[in-house]
Amino acid sequence: MAVKIRLKRMGSKKKPFYRIVVADSRFPRDGRSIETIGTYNPLLDPVEVKIDEEATLKWMHNGAKPSDTVRNLLSREGIMEKFHNQKLGK
């Protein structure tokens, strides 16, 4: 089972709102997910990103791969740096 951390589109037409979810890569984008670990709202002026850092690191240590967009969001929040430091044992 290839697990990915990716965005699940919510909200109404022309007003997207995303949940950051852990899902099997075979499931559809807006389909079933294993766990919701955060939210992303691109419509607010300072973009709103809320991520459960502990759950994200747990899933990444278990082998979940973030999508490109989620990887950028995690980098902006400083989670990718913490993940790499933990992986290298710093």
UniProtKB/Swiss-Prot annotation:
Keywords for the protein's UniProt record, in alphabetical order: Ribonucleoprotein, Ribosomal protein
GO biological-process terms attached to the record: translation
Family: Belongs to the bacterial ribosomal protein bS16 family.
Protein's recorded name: Small ribosomal subunit protein bS16
Alphabetized InterPro entries for the sequence: Ribosomal_bS16 (IPR000307), Ribosomal_bS16_dom_sf (IPR023803)
Cellular-component GO terms for this entry: cytoplasm; small ribosomal subunit
Alphabetized PANTHER family for the sequence: 30S RIBOSOMAL PROTEIN S16, SMALL RIBOSOMAL SUBUNIT PROTEIN BS16M
Protein's organism: Listeria innocua serovar 6a (strain ATCC BAA-680 / CLIP 11262)
GO terms assigned for molecular function: structural constituent of ribosome
